[in-house]
Amino acid sequence: MKSEEFDVIIVGGGPIGSIASLLLSKKGLSVCLIEKNASPYPFPRGIALNGFTMGVIEELLGEKWPDFDYTTAIEVGYVLGKDRMNEPFGKMQPPVIDGEILDLDHYGFINWFNQPQLERLLRAKIEDDGGIEALYGHEALVLWEDEKNYITIQNNSTGDTKTLSSDYLIGADGGGS
């Protein structure tokens, strides 16, 4: 490990944590990315991205963008109500103005993607970046705040622990955490 003090520590190396680490590193901040899985989790969790997010991903992936597989949806299924879970009550559709689909960013209304594939591409960009300390196979155990933010992490394969500090801490460890 290069340092134990960072501008930003990000817990969670899925798409959100990985994208945040790349964006912050581009701004010159020292970043530590902590992800409990040593390799990308093999099953998708997130499945859809809006056009703005697609633009951010295209910019970050750069030359790896052509390797990113996605499918643009023209219409998106049905919205299900809480009271009528098996009965659709409305169809999500892209905005239409004067009979034309509004597509300001050329990515379409919504895009289906494969999260494990995107995570592999983002990890490759993080490795290329050089300004991000990526600790895959490490888990956050405890965090606290004093003058700075402190976090104790554990290497999942060795059991070794280490305490890191940062000015900012981002929790991007998933919806079920």
Identify the role of each PLM range.
Residues 3-33:
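N-terminal Rossmann-like FAD-binding beta1-loop-alpha1 element of flavoenzymes
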Residues 136-150:
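A conserved short coil-to-beta-strand element within the FAD-binding core of flavoproteins
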Residues 27, 128-130:
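Conserved dinucleotide-binding and phosphotransfer motif residues
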Residues 10, 21, 57, 119-122, ...:
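Conserved structural-core and active-site-/substrate-pathway-adjacent residues in large, well-folded domains
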Residues 171-177:
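Flavin (primarily FAD) binding-site architecture
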Residues 4-6, 158-168:
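Core beta-strand elements of the Rossmann-like FAD/NAD(P) dinucleotide-binding domain
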Residues 45, 49-127:
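Active-site-adjacent segment of FAD-dependent monooxygenases/related oxidoreductases
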